[in-house]
């Protein structure tokens, strides 16, 4: 009986020890569960931060692409404006050359007209005093005819020079068309490069990066956007300045064309007056 009591007492102690150990294990389990819950919350927070960084990165990439597009468009406008400025400057030089040539022809025609007028005056006086000098009169007529031939030759030479200038202008227009063709080819190449850039952008999006690397890229994108924004502003200023210069040059070209038309009309009037004078001198 005493042995049974000892055994029951031992079993009771074992039970109490087992209960204590179970309580300790349950406490440790609860601690582990709390620790796991905390870890899960930390992981969720990190994932949330990574997701936010990815969102910020995509936004930065979108802004970068838009800024690049605006910059390319502005550069294109500036390049086109500069090309138009060069074309207008070349056209102005051509107009100035034509105007100078026309003024020279006008001066020559004026001199010839003055000579013809003097010759006409001399002829009038000569007819009064040389009625009985037929040979001298005929010689004078021959001289006037030679002068007429010379004036006609000069007028034809001036016409040839004008035709040559027109031919050069036509050649210049052909070269301009070729330049436009090269510009179209360049625009096609730009389109191809934009497509390659889009493909590269898609590949970049597919890369998995850590939170620290994503933050560094986001900072780099923002710095690039600020740089591109400054370049975009500078390019827009340059494009506006080029547009103002184009307007000024266009006004100069219009003015020179008007002056050229006026000089041509003066030359035509003088030529007609010269022809009329020679016709009167020759009695036609």
UniProtKB/Swiss-Prot annotation:
It holds the Pfam family Tropomyosin. InterPro entries: Tropomyosin. Keywords: Coiled coil, Repeat. Residues 69-78 have a biased composition (Basic and acidic residues). The keyword Lipoprotein does not apply. Residues 1-284 form a coiled coil. Signal peptide: none annotated. Residues 56-78 are annotated as: Disordered. Associated with the protective tegument surrounding the sporocyst. SUPFAM superfamilies: Tropomyosin. The molecule is in a coiled coil structure that is formed by 2 polypeptide chains. The sequence exhibits a prominent seven-residues periodicity. Tropomyosin, in association with the troponin complex, plays a central role in the calcium dependent regulation of muscle contraction. PANTHER family: TROPOMYOSIN. Homodimer. Belongs to the tropomyosin family. This is Tropomyosin-2.
């Amino acid at each position: 009986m005493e042995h049974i009591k000892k055994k029951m007492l031992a079993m009771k102690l074992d039970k109490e020890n087992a209960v204590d150990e179970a309580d300790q294990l349950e406490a440790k389990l609860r601690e582990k569960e709390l620790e796991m819950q905390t870890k899960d919350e930390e992981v969720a927070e990190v994932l949330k931060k990574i997701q936010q960084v990815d969102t910020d990165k995509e936004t930065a990439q979108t802004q970068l692409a838009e800024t690049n597009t605006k910059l390319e468009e502005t550069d294109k406008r500036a390049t086109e404006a500069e090309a138009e400025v060069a074309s207008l400057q070349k056209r102005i030089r051509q107009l100035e050359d034509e105007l100078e040539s026309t003024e020279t022809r006008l001066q020559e025609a004026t001199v010839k007209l003055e000579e013809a007028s003097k010759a006409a005056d001399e002829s009038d006086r000569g007819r009064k005093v040389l009625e009985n000098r037929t040979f001298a009169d005929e010689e004078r007529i021959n001289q006037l005819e030679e002068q007429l031939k010379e004036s006609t030759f000069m007028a034809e030479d001036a016409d040839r020079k004008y035709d040559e200038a027109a031919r050069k202008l036509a050649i210049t227009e052909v070269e301009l068309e070729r330049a436009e063709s090269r510009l179209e080819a360049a625009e096609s190449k730009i389109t191809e490069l934009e497509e390659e850039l889009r493909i590269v952008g898609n590949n970049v999006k597919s890369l998995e990066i850590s939170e620290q690397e994503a933050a560094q890229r986001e900072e780099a994108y923002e710095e690039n956007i600020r740089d591109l924004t400054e370049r975009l502003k500078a390019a827009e200023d340059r494009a506006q300045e080029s547009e103002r210069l184009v307007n000024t040059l266009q006004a100069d070209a219009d003015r020179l064309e008007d002056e050229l038309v006026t000089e041509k009309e003066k030359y035509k009037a003088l030529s007609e007056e010269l022809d009329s004078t020679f016709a009167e001198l020759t009695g036609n």
